[in-house]
Every structure is written in C-alpha cells, then in structure tokens.
Amino acid sequence: EPVRELRTLLDFSHTYGYPVMMKRTDGGGGRGITVVHDDDEMRRFYMNHDAMQGGDLDEYFIEKFIDKARHVETQCGRDRFGDFTVYSTRDCSVQRRNQKLVEEAPAPFLPDEVINQLETYSRSLFNKVDYIGLGTCEFMVTPHRKVYFLEVNPRLQVEHTVSEEVCGLDLVREQIDIADGGHLTPAPAPRGHSFELRITSEDPATNLTPSSG
C-alpha cells in the first residue's frame, strides 16, 4: 500500500533495514526511484518533497533496496479452468536510469531450485486472485539467490516477444484464446536463447538523459 506519513516510512526502514527504495505513486515504471540510506536522509527526502508540494503530502511506495540484484520475470498464463503455465523466464537486469535496455530469455545462470521457486511463487500469485489471462510476475534475485517479489503486470509487455521466441507460441493468440474461454497451451521446454535490445533516444552531452531525438 502507498505510504504518506514519515513515521510509517521510518518504521518500515527500521523493521527491514536500510537502504530502502522510495518511489512516488505517480511515477511510472522505474522513474522517480530514490535510494535512502539512513534516518537523516529519509527526513531530508520527506521534507524536500513536502516543501515542493506546498504541504500537500505525496504518497510513496517503499521497499527494501537490494544491491546488485538481478531483475528476473516469469511470463505466465492461467485459464478459467485453473490450468497454469510459465512460458519462460526473462532477465531484464541491464538497465539505465531504472529503465530496461536488454531483455533475455530464458534468464541465464539460474539454478533449477531458483527457477522452481519463481514458478511456485508465480503460480500461487495467479491462483490467489483467480487471474485469467497472461501476465508477468517480476522478482529481484540477490547474489545469494534469495528471491524478493516485485510486482505483477496484468498484461503482455513489450518484451513478451523474447518469450515467444523460446517457447514457440504466439502469446497474443494465447491471450485471446484464454479470454474466449479456451484452454491455455502448456509451455514446452525452452528452445534456444533470445534477446531484445531497446533503441532509446538519449543525449550523451547531458549524461545520457532522455531526449526527444
């Protein structure tokens, strides 16, 4: 849930430990993320944003910050009959300014136990809310292979094509068939390896900030 009060932000940080990651609720994707390392920094962050809003307090998402983590996703599907499948894993760890630049499927260098854990968590999430259709579960995986849940995207994302390449299925068609009341197609074993590289418009003269081109 979004958090508004400074006391709640501090309590969370004391419970889970610094550093923590702050993000305003009105920032899409990875935009607006700030890493906070201690109580003094949290108070400065909070007061600066409060002042900029003229006393109209923002709401924030706060999470434990995982240093040097990998951003790993599962492309999942579930039909109205309760059948579930993971079409592929994806690694989206290559980013700039918290925006994805390279997507890779299947996610490399993951041991079977971590893959099984990701699939178990994803299945549980979809079953819990009786999710029907295709979606993406996103996780952070630490260097010690500890898994943290990030979010569910209840849609196909632009990087779904790398999953299509390795599972051999048309995922847009899958989504339509499931919405029409059909059964999902169980995902076959991954074949080969696939990359998607995003072309972005950035200005090298200003530290690669986004540019209109």
Label each PLM-derived region with a short phrase.
Residues 1-32:
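A conserved helix-loop-beta module that forms one wall/lid of the active-site cleft
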